[in-house]
């Protein structure tokens, strides 16, 4: 996760955004989230909705590492634009 931050966002906002993205990727890959993780996503439903469209598509054959790497690449490309 990028700890340098983004302009206009507090470290807490960045943490929430990153955690939402990771949990959504895990859910999309078929992982069962814990009750506290599901509650976190419900609590930050607005962030969840904005992040869903940003998740990279993945094949069921792709491993978790490949999906995370693809997501990291897309994040890097977004920041360069």
UniProtKB/Swiss-Prot annotation:
Keywords attached to this entry: Cytoplasm, Nucleus, Phosphoprotein, Wnt signaling pathway
Entries under InterPro entries matching the protein: ICAT_dom (IPR009428), ICAT_sf (IPR036911)
Compartment(s): Cytoplasm; Nucleus
Keyword Transmembrane in record: no
Signal peptide: none
GO biological process: anterior/posterior pattern specification; branching involved in ureteric bud morphogenesis; negative regulation of canonical Wnt signaling pathway; negative regulation of mesenchymal cell proliferation; negative regulation of protein binding; negative regulation of protein-containing complex assembly; negative regulation of smooth muscle cell proliferation; negative regulation of transcription by RNA polymerase II
Membership in a protein family: Belongs to the CTNNBIP1 family.
PANTHER family, A to Z: BETA-CATENIN-INTERACTING PROTEIN 1
Subunit annotation: Binds CTNNB1.
Name by which UniProt lists this protein: Beta-catenin-interacting protein 1
